[in-house]
Amino acid sequence: MEPEVVAAGIVKKRTFKKFSFRGVDLDALLDMSIEDLVKHFSSRIRRRFSRGLTRKPMALIKKLRKAKMEAPAGEKPASVRTHLRNMIIVPEMIGSIIGVYNGKTFNQVEIKPEMIGHYLAEFSISYKPVKHGRPGVGATNSSRFIPLK
């Protein structure tokens, strides 16, 4: 900061980047109908919505609404568990906490605005990443000569 500003005692307010999804701000996204919202999604997700929402995703959204209504003001809503890894995140879900099943456990995922248009599965990894060990017996000649620890 400039010394004149510090000497005057004026503190400049920090400005944060306002979230927007494909040029539309968050408040407008929350007010949009699903038909208008789908126009901003990628083609894969537009196709998914055009084929219709079945009963299961709608049941999850109803449970999320109920959890938000029952939560006290200023508190996070209760977690809602689901196996629906193929559910697409819509603006209505923002702020909710969802337990996404990965085949073994439910991973807690707090929905943030940046997640709109992604699948729930992208935030709950279903496999354990490989930690490679030492080269084995059948390894090639060049990889056998890695110095031992």
From Swiss-Prot:
<dbReference type="GO" id="GO:0006412">
    <property type="term" value="P:translation"/>
</dbReference>
<comment type="similarity">
    <text>Belongs to the universal ribosomal protein uS19 family.</text>
</comment>
<dbReference type="Pfam" id="PF00203">
    <property type="entry name" value="Ribosomal_S19"/>
</dbReference>
<keyword id="KW-0963">Cytoplasm</keyword>
<protein>
    <recommendedName>
        <fullName>Small ribosomal subunit protein uS19w</fullName>
    </recommendedName>
</protein>
<dbReference type="InterPro" id="IPR023575">
    <property type="entry name" value="Ribosomal_uS19_SF"/>
</dbReference>
<dbReference type="InterPro" id="IPR020934">
    <property type="entry name" value="Ribosomal_uS19_CS"/>
</dbReference>
<dbReference type="InterPro" id="IPR005713">
    <property type="entry name" value="Ribosomal_uS19_euk/arc"/>
</dbReference>
<dbReference type="InterPro" id="IPR002222">
    <property type="entry name" value="Ribosomal_uS19"/>
</dbReference>
<dbReference type="GO" id="GO:0003723">
    <property type="term" value="F:RNA binding"/>
</dbReference>
<keyword id="KW-0687">Ribonucleoprotein</keyword>
<dbReference type="GO" id="GO:0022627">
    <property type="term" value="C:cytosolic small ribosomal subunit"/>
</dbReference>
<keyword id="KW-0689">Ribosomal protein</keyword>
<dbReference type="GO" id="GO:0003735">
    <property type="term" value="F:structural constituent of ribosome"/>
</dbReference>
